[in-house]
Amino acid sequence: MAKKAPARTVKPRAAKRPARPAFSDWETPRITGLLVLADGTVIEGFGFGAEGEAVGEVCFNTAMTGYQEVLTDPSYAGQIVTFTFPHIGNVGTNEDDIETTNLAATSGVRGCVVKAAVTDPANYRSHRHFSQWLRTRGIIGLSGIDTRALTNLIREKGMPNGVIAHHARGNFDLKKLKALAAQWPGLVGMDLAKDVSLTQRMEWDETSWDWKSGYGRRNGIATHKVVAVDYGLKRNILRCLTDAGCEVTVVPANAEADDILALNPDGIFLSNGPGDPEATGVYAVPEIRKLVSSGKPVFGICLGHQMLALALGAKTRKMHQGHHGANHPVKDFTTGKVEITSMNHGFTVDRETLPQGVVETHVSLFDGSNCGIALEGKPVFSVQYHPEASPGPQDSHYLFKRFVEQMDKAKG
């Protein structure tokens, strides 16, 4: 019988120890972003988007969607936007949904503050990562922030001036940043419309976005000709006017009434925009008075609403915390209905100063502030909120129809 070979003794191989992490892996992540408020408060976080420093008024926006539209809305010029919804940037960005009409200028927004770190985009329409997109537009981002606490601070103390800063190495000159925040004069008395407005006339014919075909072009002959004055005009307002059958010509903020009327419009639109209405009104309000006197239908939104009120004899004032979001309830006194609206303003028409003959048509159900006016006996009206819904609900699209009906009536 053959002998069995002796069993081999196999020494078990020692398990390979995982490499010990370098000390730096255990360190607290480096702070690369700061928000420094005018009262000296320093809020630490992580920078993304553009690097550098920018000063502005810190506000909060409660919309859950539409961050790209918000950050390209010229009405946010001079502001640092805090998003209360925690997940921002997760559907990426594209070049189609930009709201700035004047592509030669930036929207003017100074920065954005978010809670969660920005993730890779997951959306079939996305062209670029949110952080990369911010970098190309020169907008500073700050993540890792307790946005609920910051929002409560704004609600209690008002919208503070502040500096948002992003440096990859975390090298900050706190003394300098605090001085910048404390010395910035704020938005009162600031005319920002001139910085975001077109500088020359433009024709517009793009229509609203469709699931099948995207943004389109007006088909057929327009039924009405509208001149839109650009104080910081959003594209979706122009699309809504085009959808309503209007041929739209856009003119700069400093356009004179005589030049506007020489275009022989059926109606005149006064757009949204940033800054203090009294400051922009220095040159705009006298022209608006002439437009109202012409008898042409006039429709205003946001800054256009405020300056129309000034032209009719009312006054405006700075708000404590402003209205920024897509969930603001407004009551329409003409119908008795309540609509959910999109808002973005830090100034408001003082309802106590509305003169005789100017009727309050809409009011905020949050704080009772004025949200709409109409001039008795004339086709002139305006609203404080954004009926074009970008972002936001579409409850107020009827206002564009109302404008068209007034033009129909004026034409006979």
Where are these regions (language model features)?
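RNA-binding accessory domains that recognize and position tRNA/RNA substrates
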Residues: 2-263, 275, 390-395, 401-412
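Active-site-proximal beta-strand elements of phosphoester/diester hydrolases
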Residues: 225-230, 341-342, 381-385
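Proline-centered loop/turn at the N-terminus of a beta-strand
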Residues: 140, 225, 297-299, 315, ...
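Residue-level structural signal for beta-strand termini and adjacent loop
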Residues: 47-48, 86, 344, 375, ...
